[in-house]
A protein has these predicted regions:
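A detector of single, family-specific signature residues
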Residues: 1-239
Length: 241
């Protein structure tokens, strides 16, 4: 048998892939297979399908966007396999007919959506985009750490009955008040360590934000950033996300 295009639905998980094939001619999914979570297993599966559909068959593989990211996409396309990442909320087949969730059923739904074009593809970032995104995640991780240490300092003060009379926390006046506190014995050392961590993280975030401003001037991003900066209150680090 020779078919022009075979659509391969892939339900991907950390430990395993569930695969199936779908053709417009047959109007049904077939050749279900569960494999290890390895792109080479997908390549082996496609070779198996060639023995059924012929050497002239074209394969289009697809999987839902999720925690797996773009790794599988890049691995398959590097091996000249067309791959599409589907936006889950745009999959019409999933919305209307999905009932009992199983890996096999999910793979079938993905294959059908590919064949019937009932989906919108996810934008695939460039390698530079991904690097920048990881940089932003790292900056946000430090921001969360700063938020945590702020909470710890305020909790420490509350436990030891140090009450600030000013209106706002983390102003220059509040920081001056914190540094002027004189807890007894080891408590002083504890507060000093908290404040040192606070200052270190604050300085680092300021440095990272300056680096993000530099990245935003690159040709790939500067025009979009320039347009969005017209909105009041929108910062560069937010635009990048």
């Amino acid at each position: 048998m020779n078919y022009n295009t075979v659509y391969v639905g892939m339900d991907v998980h950390k430990e395993s892939f569930s695969l199936c094939a779908y053709t417009i001619e047959a109007e049904k999914a077939s050749h279900y297979q569960r494999t290890e979570a390895d792109y080479k297993k997908v390549l082996n599966y496609l070779e198996f399908l060639r023995t059924i559909y012929g050497d002239d068959a074209n394969f289009i593989c697809g999987y839902e966007a999720g925690c797996f990211g773009y790794t599988l996409y890049h691995q398959l396309t590097a091996n000249n396999v067309k791959c599409i990442i589907l936006a889950p909320t745009t999959m019409l087949e999933q919305r209307s007919k999905k009932r009992i969730k199983t890996d096999r059923r999910d793979a079938e739904i993905i294959a059908k959506c590919l064949a019937q074009h009932n989906y919108s593809p996810v934008h695939i970032p460039t390698a530079k985009d991904e690097e920048t995104k990881e940089f932003l995640r790292m900056r946000d991780d430090h921001k969360l750490a700063l938020k945590k240490v702020k909470q710890q300092i305020l909790a420490f003060c509350l436990r030891h009955n140090y009450r600030y009379d000013g209106k706002s926390h983390w102003t220059a006046a509040h920081l001056k008040w914190l540094k002027a506190l004189t807890p007894e014995a080891l408590y002083k050392e504890i507060l000093d360590e908290y404040l040192l961590t606070y200052q270190t993280l604050s300085d680092k975030i300021e440095r990272l934000d300056k680096r993000i401003e530099e990245l935003a001037t690159q040709d790939e991003y500067k025009e979009a950033v320039k347009k969005l900066c017209c909105f009041i209150g929108v910062k560069t680090c937010l635009l990048y996300t």
